Amino acid sequence: MYHQEQHPVGAPPPQGYPPKDGYPPAGYPPAGYPPPGYAQGYPAQGYPPPQYSQAPQQKQNAGMLEGCLAALCCCCLLDACF
């Protein structure tokens, strides 16, 4: 015999209504948001945005060249051995 507990069925809470305490909740976002040291949002109107220096570029072409030369040397070595 199969027994299953029956829980009372009720209506789900209404969707799309603000919480009882209003929105946003008290203390959200905290005072001084964003914290010091983080981006402060958009610059004031009439002032240019801050300039950031570019990160140094890595030598991607050298890595590819080194890989191709290593493969070529490996092929030559295998050709000489067999």
From Swiss-Prot:
The chain crosses the membrane at residues 59-76. Residues 1-58 are annotated as: Disordered. It comes from the Eukaryota. It is found in: Cell membrane. Belongs to the CYSTM1 family. GO terms for biological process: megasporogenesis. Required for the promotion of megasporogenesis, or promotion of germ cell formation from somatic precursor cells. Acts redundantly with WIH2. Functions in a genetic pathway downstream of SPL/NZZ and WUS and together with TRN2 in promoting megasporogenesis. Involved in resistance to abiotic stress. It is a single-pass membrane protein. Pfam families: CYSTM. Keywords: Cell membrane, Membrane, Transmembrane, Transmembrane helix. Expressed in root meristem, root vasculature, leaf vasculature and floral organ primordia. Mostly expressed in roots and flowers and, to a lower extent, in stems, siliques and leaves. Residues 26-37 have a biased composition (Pro residues). One of its GO terms (cellular component) is plasma membrane. Disruption phenotype: No visible phenotype under normal growth conditions, but flowers of the double mutants wih1-1 and wih2-1 have defect in megasporgogenesis. Doubl mutant plants display retarded growth, and twisted leaves, siliques and roots. This is Protein CYSTEINE-RICH TRANSMEMBRANE MODULE 13. GO terms for molecular function: protein homodimerization activity. The gene is WIH1. Homodimer and heterodimers. Interacts with CYSTM7, CYTSM3, CYTSM4, CYTSM5, CYTSM6, CYTSM9, CYTSM10 and CYTSM11. Binds weakly to CYSTM1 and CYSTM2. Disulfide bonds: none annotated. Induction: Induced by heat in roots.
